Amino acid sequence: MAERFVVTGGNRLSGEVAVGGAKNSVLKLMAATLLAEGTSTITNCPDILDVPLMAEVLRGLGATVELDGDVARITSPDEPKYDADFAAVRQFRASVCVLGPLVGRCKRARVALPGGDAIGSRPLDMHQAGLRQLGATCNIEHGCVVAQADTLRGAEIQLEFPSVGATENILMAAVVAEGVTTIHNAAREPDVVDLCTMLNQMGAQVEGAGSPTMTITGVPRLYPTEHRVIGDRIVAATWGIAAAMTRGDISVTGVDPAHLQVVLHKLHDAGATVTQTDDSFRVTQYERPKAVNVATLPFPGFPTDLQPMAIALASIADGTSMITENVFEARFRFVEEMIRLGADARTDGHHAVVRGLPQLSSAPVWCSDIRAGAGLVLAGLVADGDTEVHDVFHIDRGYPLFVENLAILGAEIERVE
């Protein structure tokens, strides 16, 4: 039988929790090492399932990968394999981020269409269009993205939407293209900035990271480097929301609060006291949270990854909240599980209207993705009795030491077979 969590509600969470490296950053950094022959070292890697999965992807492409605690040492060969059509690639979404580096380094790639979280359509149209503008052919053939180029040349690329994945794949091909590439409407997420920082350390010439317009001057080759992953803002915010929901007092370290300003402002609006330093923040909630409206948007807006936690918070807030999802269309299936817990919520697929109740009621629930799983656990913390959360392998893909950290903060939670 698959593992599950049993969460006993009613405890106030308090204490300090340290956040590790960002899941949404480390996997792309690992892929970027393919661009330079030799050994690169990435530190502050989170202890999550997706890191060894990405290591398997890189090994399948000819790299040597050593994982030691929070350190990944990746040796990229002089001629990486370009065919990424094997089981590890199909297991999770981020594996598609090897497309850009392979096209850049090998001038060809064959990458199996990836799996990952069940949160709606995430087409690769913009990835393909961007690579075509750089001079590559790029098509879907027999379940794989197949790309090839004689020469990559810089281009003016206008993204329809500031897609993180498309920005990163185009970026990692453009850094070794001839001439100058400009990406308009580029993603501004801290994870993209982190990737640009590492690429520049490798010898790339990327300007404008964190702004809507990114300029890349291609260079003939890149070199290995050492880089520290930024702290995980999504994990950090999850702990902040947990403090607000349980009327707790949690200090979160190892993350830049500048990456979370819209979230911290929403917690303040919900009645929490929020204090910040350069690399930490503290959330204290004394009363029942107030209802707040949330609309997900690309950075610097409210992250779509935190939408389930926003719904969980709204479910026990004083008043009615509207949560609007503007990024992934299928993310509201989480609401069905919240209704099992007694939440008063309804959705039309784009909005969720949630009328807060003083308390939820325990029930068996099932995770559909990483963040929905975390949201269900937070809901279990404020439900009466024991809530069983199933399919928790999703949570393990994105939250290091999740049960251990919750227990340290005072939650009553256990992992059972």
Swiss-Prot record:
Report the principal subcellular site.
Answer: cytoplasm
Pathway the protein acts in: Cell wall biogenesis; peptidoglycan biosynthesis
Q: List the catalytic activities from the record.
A: phosphoenolpyruvate + UDP-N-acetyl-alpha-D-glucosamine = UDP-N-acetyl-3-O-(1-carboxyvinyl)-alpha-D-glucosamine + phosphate
- For whether the record's keyword set contains Transport, the answer is no
On the tree of life, the source organism's domain of life is: Bacteria
Q: Which InterPro entries match?
A: Enolpyruvate_Tfrase_dom, Enolpyruvate_Tfrase_sf, MurA_subfamily, RNA3'P_cycl/enolpyr_Trfase_a/b, UDP_GlcNAc_COvinyl_MurA
What does the entry list as the binding residues for phosphoenolpyruvate?
K23, N24
Cellular component GO terms, alphabetical: cytoplasm
Q: Which HAMAP family match?
A: MurA (MF_00111)
Q: What does this protein do?
A: Cell wall formation. Adds enolpyruvyl to UDP-N-acetylglucosamine.
What protein am I looking at?
UDP-N-acetylglucosamine 1-carboxyvinyltransferase
Taxon lineage: Bacteria, Bacillati, Actinomycetota, Actinomycetes, Mycobacteriales
